[in-house]
Amino acid sequence: MGKSLYIAEKPSVAREFAKALKYDMKNKDGYMESQEAVVTWCVGHLVTMSYPEVYDEKYRRWSLDTIPFIPEEFKYEVIDSVKKQFGIVSGLLNREDVETIYVCTDSGREGEYIYRLVEQQAGVEGKVRKRVWIDSQTEEEILRGIREAKDLSAYDNLSDAAYLRAKEDYLMGINFSRALTLKYSYPIKNYLQTDKAVVSVGRVMTCVLGMVVNREREIREFVKIPFYRILLQVAIEGHECTFEWKATEESKYYQSPKIYKDNGFLEEKEADAFISFLQEEPKEEPVIRKIEKKKETKNPPLLYNLAELQNDCSKLFKISPDETLRIAQELYEKKLTTYPRTDARVLSTAVAKEIAKNIGGLKNYHVAAEYAAEILNKGSYRGIEKTRYVNDKQITDHYAIIPTGQGFGSLNSLHPASAKVYEIIVRRFLSVFYPAAVYQKISIGVQMKGETFTSGFKVLADPGYLKVAQNSFARKKTEEYTEEEKKEEVKEEACDASFMEALSALKKGMNLTAGELSKKEGETSPPKRYNSGSMILAMENAGQFIEDEELRAQIKGSGIGTSATRAEILKKLVHIKYLDLNKKTQIITPTLLGEMIYEVVAGAIRPLLDPRLTASWEKGLTLVASGEITEKEYMVKLDDFVTRRTNAVKQMNNQATLIHRFHYASQFYKK
């Protein structure tokens, strides 16, 4: 009987498979072996696409005469730095006594690509090939993955999408970077007084640059509008409460052009005149005209996917997206959490049925022990599969990031940043087994001289899930409001239960005692700059930038890049100095070079800056992976796009106009 060969993506994962198999494994050079099985590993990518000069030496020199470069058949080669390990893996794949190959690379598009390239380059034939697809690296999950492994051919569509993604990035990168560099490097070099300038272009990278530059320009062009709100102090049961004027239908200022959004005067003198009118004799006390009492519930948020985790870590801890991904990968490899590169924020039905194991394990984690025990004692995990936190239709490759309830031997060795990330994953997970938080809210409207003032009050009646979610550092508010929203929202004063009872006793028609009348100056605020976390979310939700409803519906679920690549793209843009990332605040801004590159692309291949195009390409890859369109159909469109756009750039002669654009942009970067 032949042996089984297990091939993982990296050595640490291979060791976990070897442990789970419980064979008497002997360490060899680049693999482990027992009488029954062999376990080996890649070290990330072992094979890559060949540079153009491998096809023909004429392509080594950049020239407009040799583009567009679109090979009929793509060439691949082993990466020099990992040739030894490739030789070992290739030899094992082709060993006569190896009968079955278990592909154990990461369960996703990129993991599939890593293995398929190795198999292609090694020329593997005549073997049974199985795909192990797992969501965590616990022993049970590894054994389940092996037991339920499907034939590798079931993942051929995913493999096609992986190959296409690489070809797309390769063709756009080589052709567009060469075309734009050859056409526009001179004006860039000349303007910046540098020795060389390469215009780096990428399907996703250039689109992200466009989003950041466009946001920066919105901020520059924003004209602030000052306004003056009118505030009234009212005494209620010994408390000084602030009420705010609003131009309701009864007001003489209703829909007046002098008013900004119903609650502020555009001119200070108008605000002063209004206050004088209210203070004129005979004075009036405010009379209660409206009291509304209601309960408001706040449900636990959905579970973390990678983008949401990166966003929260950026806001809470000022950790960059690539660092968050590194930590999430570390937690996964230490068996503490499930697979990190996921877009889903829900669980699968199958996982939901076994979720008590995850919760039970968390009784060994001091931060969560009390909550885990409470959930198990109350049985609140039962029926979770009937809630919004479980939805098989919203899962493509993997469910949300959750704790496994295992791996606690590694907890003490975690870096403090990793420990914090683990804690918020645990808290988010346990939150979904608690009820909604309940607020008692009262809004009061009073009238004085026919003008209305309102105020709102609330008390937390039942903390529900908040007692789990908002402890420790996680108490910081993770929702972001613009400054304008903060200024304009009707203020709801947090109050205690006894004062809420006093408020509840108030009745319509009752007189209250007026205190000071004052004006408060405010101003409209420009859009916020992206931070590293909000940028990741914007990339994930590219559809929000699309006004056409039909097109937005078509690309729903497709963002810019993937959960596995977004952080790396941001990192690259910072590395090549197109973007600047403030490490302390995580705020992202363009550099002068980045804005100049934006101008070059805008004048030559503008669609590359458009989230609609980038998201539609990503949607196409998803359709290939699901078998809805063929690899050939996708490739025809890709070839046509690259050919047309490259040839168009070759015919352009707009370099002189760029200097004016460069000069205009540079004024915003002078120190």
Predicted segments — roles?
Residues F74, G87, E96, Q137-V234, ...:
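C-terminal or mid-to-C-terminal helical accessory/interaction module adjacent to the motor/catalytic core
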Residues G2-L5, L93, S153, I219-E221, ...:
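Basic, low-complexity terminal or inter-domain segments flanking catalytic cores
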Residues A14-K22, R116-L117, L209-I219, R427:
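Short active-site loop/helix that positions an aromatic residue
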